[in-house]
Design a protein with these regions (language model features):
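PRPP-associated nucleotide enzymes
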Residues: 1-200
Length: 200
């Protein structure tokens, strides 16, 4: 059975192949012949860039209002884009099998996927920012500084856009969650490049 995500990546032009002799540098510091823009599964490059702009502006503002600003845009796109909606449904079904208390996602592209999955599961969402600050939004949509959310002893599924060697996990996501006394029990990525990240 063909994986629909592979088809959707090509349908949304999310896969870019490098020019000969000019490999891409990945965030992980590795070189590679192709680049995957998983955020294009949001519907298109244009739609993804628009949401990235909203995310960047919301990150720069009051972080307690971050979730509402970003999720409002995501909700509209879920209604408008069948590929994005079907992807979130697939990810939600995978996450539903995991014994977790909340969903976490990291700035920026993880939010495309972590926020709607948390909402569909009826779980809270931990938004982790690049400065390692975090905001927890409970299942009712109420946001608070994560330190006030009583997450000690809780387990999350961290939902990522893409994993190569899991450098963002090591550098930021795991320390942020563990700093709250919680644990990333599972990780769910749209794409795992199978370059060692799943071993972390």
């Amino acid at each position: 059975m063909e994986n629909p995500i592979v088809s959707w990546l090509f349908e949304t032009d999310a896969v870019r192949v490098c020019p000969e002799g000019q490999p891409f540098w990945y965030t992980s510091g590795k070189l590679g012949p192709f680049y995957i823009n998983t955020q294009f599964l949001y519907g298109s490059e244009e739609a993804a860039n628009a949401l990235l702009t909203v995310i960047e502006q919301a990150c720069a503002g009051d972080k307690l209002r971050f979730y509402d600003k970003v999720y409002g845009e995501i909700e509209k796109q879920l209604a408008a884009c069948p590929i994005y909606r079907q992807l979130i449904d697939l990810m939600t079904e995978a996450a539903r099998k995991m014994d977790v208390d909340f969903v976490s996602g990291g700035e920026r592209r993880d939010f495309f996927f972590s926020m709607p999955v948390a909402r569909k599961l009826g779980l809270g969402h931990l938004s982790i920012f690049k400065d390692l600050s975090s905001v927890y939004t409970d299942a009712n949509g109420v946001s608070m500084p994560a330190g006030q959310a009583s997450l000690s002893g809780k387990r999350s599924v961290h939902i990522a856009d893409l994993v190569t060697v899991a450098s963002s996990y090591i550098r930021a996501w795991i320390p942020a969650v563990e700093g709250l006394g919680a644990k990333i029990a599972y990780s769910l990525a749209v794409v795992d490049r199978d370059q060692g990240g799943s071993d972390i």
